[in-house]
Regions:
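Bacterial extracytoplasmic/cell-wall-associated proteins, especially those involved in peptidoglycan
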Residues: 2-111
Length: 111
């Protein structure tokens, strides 16, 4: 079983926001989450297709999921630090994105 199987699609999306853009604050995490949603909407194989989870975990796309980068840290946040404020913020953004109510502040960007 993959170490990411314990997470829902929303959690994977939120952790991607944290892993890629935590240092940029809420706006940066929203931009990352927007790009994931835009890639899923584009449904391009090399970007992971139309599934949010697959887009996030597609090898070579979001560096935080690549082995040797931030992967262990973000998995740890998801499994043992549910109250970590950037993660809480990203979860709210991810829930809104999946519900279709998060504004796209990237103007359709995929990167």
């Amino acid at each position: 079983m993959s170490d990411t199987n314990v997470f829902s699609d929303v959690e994977i999306l939120a952790l991607t926001g944290v892993g890629e853009s935590e240092s940029l604050g809420e706006k940066g995490m929203q931009q990352t989450i927007n790009t994931v949603m835009n890639r899923a909407a584009a449904d391009v194989d090399w970007m992971g297709g139309s599934d949010v989870r697959t887009v996030c975990l597609q090898p070579g796309q979001y560096d935080c999921w690549n082995p040797g980068n931030d992967r262990d840290r973000i998995i740890s946040i998801g499994t043992s630090k549910p109250d970590y404020q950037p993660y809480v913020t990203a979860l709210g953004l991810a829930e809104s994105a999946v519900a279709g109510s998060l504004p796209d502040i990237t103007n359709g960007a995929v990167s």
